[in-house]
Amino acid sequence: MEQSSEVGSNLGSWDHKRDGSVRSGIKLSRAITISANFTQNLSTTRNSTGLEQMSMTRDYVAYGELLNEGLPFPGWSFRLTGLEKWPIIKRFAKSASMEHSFSGKETRSWQFEDGSPEQMNFFSFGTFASEYKDNERSSRINQNFSPLIGLNLTLKKNISLTFRNNMSKSLDETPTGLTIQNDNSYTSTGTYTHRGGMNIPVPFYGTLNLNNTISFTLNFDLNESREERSGDKINLEVGSFSESWKTGLRMSYQFSTKVSGGVRYEYRESDTRTTGKKVDRDFGFDVNLAISG
């Protein structure tokens, strides 16, 4: 009997992953807290035909119009409390704090037809990426400020205010070109709450005590998004863009533990490259009754 030449040729697949991370945090004072985190992941997969795929993800800080410069660097977060003690803020705020956070990632993948000539390691990745650029199949670099700046204020007379500005930028690159995405958003919320009550005389019952809570919430959101593309990886052209903003007011009330409701109104505007300008308005109300038997 003739033996097939394919017998025993399927060697299966091989998968290897290496992960490393470092975390640190420090409290400089009762009001200042800083934390940092760095993570790097390496992955290698080889199938039975000898095709090898490698990928790497690590924390990264990029700069330049095309995010083509940068260095491995940990993400960080920063929080500052006690701003209500500052000379101007203490005049109107009962409590105040500020936040800031950054995270950036670099992700790359390669493909080798007959196996890679060498293995990546944590300390010489830059040399590996430069030497085998022709084998690179995709890369992504993104940086995210979430928030770039965030403020939390509690004012007198039960008024609270929040503000957030988030920014992100990403670069996706393939052998055929690259895409850059820019996003920017502003979010603010103001809330006023009043708690009170009333006494209503009821015949043959006595006095009926009604405790009520009324709150007013005002929101404002602004979002901007812009995509740029380049086939030659040098000259950029706008691919798509969108801008939108909305504001809304909601009044909520609670007359007792069994009766609550609210009224809301929202106005929205948006403008995109494909659909143009659009305006929406929304009005509604709700009533909630708790019935128990």
Over which residues does each language-model region extend?
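Exposed, low-structure sequence patches enriched in small/polar residues
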Residues: 1-293
